[in-house]
Regions:
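Glycine-rich anion/phosphate-binding loops
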Residues: 21-31, 58-70
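Conserved catalytic region of serine esterases and O-acyltransferases that act on ester linkages
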Residues: 113, 117, 140-195
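Surface-exposed cleft-lining segments at the edges of enzyme active sites
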Residues: 52-62, 95-99
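Serine-esterase "nucleophile elbow" of acetyl-processing enzymes
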Residues: 1-22, 32-41, 45
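A short helix->loop->beta-strand "cap" motif at the edges of active sites that frequently abuts
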Residues: 77-82, 120
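Cell-envelope and extracellular/periplasmic
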Residues: 20-24, 49-54
Length: 195
């Protein structure tokens, strides 16, 4: 919010309300956060959701996207500009999280279509290659670290300014090679702590 005030798309009159709660599912976002955002009647709402839904086995990705679109429609019909964020690429994530890649990719395809249909700005986290270094992630390897949040905030501002992604191409940082025994032990510890 501080960066937005001094940016070409911001103003001194900017007021900021963070309604986000980590771990929410799309249903909860629609039922709790979107109505509150509508009450505030802002000029802009940023909405990122669905990642936790994608992690749940059996979730109908198409249905989640349809619900997300309902929220976007409600915001746009109220005259609110919408900044949407898509899911990150799990290609270099832990072996368990890596398995979500097809689900996240399908969900992201829906999000891009929603953004186009309703004239929304897209924060492309999938394409933000600088996001994939280990320092960008919290110990749970699901949520961003402070450095990751800063990078995403910078990119959100760039998206609002219609600037290109800061790095292009498909290269992602390599994961360090670890002995299989070490990798299995680390993954088992991660599962116990974070799943």
């Amino acid at each position: 919010a501080e960066q937005l005030v001094t940016s070409p798309v911001g103003s001194e009159d900017l007021r900021y309300a963070n309604l986000a709660i980590l771990g929410r599912l799309v249903d909860s976002i629609i039922e709790e956060q979107v109505p509150r955002a509508l009450e505030l009647a802002p000029d802009l709402v940023s909405i990122v959701g669905g990642g936790n839904d994608c992690m749940r086995p059996g979730t109908d990705i198409d249905a989640i996207a349809a619900k997300f679109e309902e929220a976007v429609v409600a915001l746009r019909e109220a005259g609110i500009a919408v900044l949407m964020g898509n899911g990150y690429d799990t290609r270099r994530a832990t072996p368990l999280i890596k398995q979500l890649r097809p689900r996240v990719a399908i969900y992201n395809s829906h999000l891009w279509s929603i953004a186009q249909r309703h004239d929304c700005t897209m924060l492309d986290m999938w394409g933000l290659r600088d996001l994939y270094g280990p320092e960008m992630w919290a110990p749970d390897r699901i949520h961003l670290s402070p450095a990751g949040h800063e990078l995403v905030a910078d990119q959100a501002l760039a998206a609002l300014e219609r600037a290109p992604l800061p790095s292009a191409g498909v290269h992602m940082p390599d994961r360090p090679n670890r002995p299989i025994r070490t990798a299995v032990a680390e993954e088992a510890h991660w599962v116990r702590e974070h799943l």
